[in-house]
């Protein structure tokens, strides 16, 4: 694996067990730090992937800058101890987000490009940003300059995106004036409330789609959302994939 620096995550990640052919949790390895030239290559890979998606018929692309994945690792001062243009200052640690977003937008159109961030996120052994207001205020302001179609905010805690008075949410909302998408613990009622208060313009829903094959109908009719079994998320076969029932009216 590669990363901004040779700092391993504590804990385990999902990988394929070659002996059984099934996914299993394995201890995280220490990544190899990308060279500056390799980082430039990563930008090119994002651009090519975006072009491929549009050529395949997708309406747009979303740059994944959240949840402890590569871009989020570059942002994190606890995982990024680089001494080049991608490390050190807040601006340098956010540089990869902005360069990729800029190049992808130039390649496929800003109106077809969004980006996802996860303020306060602790997924995949991430630690909270020590300066969230400064970091995400800067990112929101710079991303607005690119004219992206939307900014997608994921809340792992499923708390702050539901609070229209949350200080960070209000800051981001003020600096990024294009469409704002919110994600994290939304039900139909909570989604309607967030839209009504103007906290967000779009609501994203993830895991409920796994356990609710009729999710859209449930939301329209106000039916309770069925819970999911996270133990089946990474298994092969139909269990936890094709066996969730629809609701009975």
Where are the regions a protein language model picked out?
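Flavin-dependent oxidoreductase catalytic cores
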Residues: 1-249
């Amino acid at each position: 694996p590669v990363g901004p620096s040779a700092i391993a995550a504590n804990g385990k990640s999902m990988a394929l067990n070659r002996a059984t052919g099934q996914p299993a949790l394995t201890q995280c390895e220490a990544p190899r730090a990308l060279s500056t030239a390799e980082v430039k290559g990563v930008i090119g890979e994002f651009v090519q992937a975006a072009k491929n998606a549009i050529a395949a018929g997708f309406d747009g692309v979303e740059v994944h800058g959240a949840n402890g994945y590569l871009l989020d690792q570059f942002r994190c001062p606890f995982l990024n101890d680089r001494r080049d243009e991608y490390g050190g200052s807040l601006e340098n640690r956010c540089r990869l987000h902005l360069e990729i977003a800029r190049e992808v937008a130039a390649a496929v159109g800003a109106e077809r490009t969004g980006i996802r961030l996860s303020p306060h996120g602790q997924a995949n052994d991430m630690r909270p940003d020590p300066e969230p207001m400064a970091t995400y205020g800067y990112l929101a302001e710079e991303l607005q300059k690119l004219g992206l179609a939307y900014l997608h905010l994921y809340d792992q805690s499923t708390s702050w995106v539901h609070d229209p008075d949350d200080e960070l949410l209000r800051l981001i909302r003020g600096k990024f004036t294009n469409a704002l998408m919110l994600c994290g613990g939304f039900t139909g009622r909570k989604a309607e409330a967030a839209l009504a208060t103007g906290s967000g313009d779009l609501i994203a829903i993830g895991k409920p789609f796994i356990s609710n094959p009729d999710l859209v109908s449930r939301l329209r009719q106000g039916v309770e959302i069925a819970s999911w079994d996270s133990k089946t998320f990474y298994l092969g076969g139909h269990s936890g994939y094709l066996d969730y029932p629809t609701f009975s009216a």
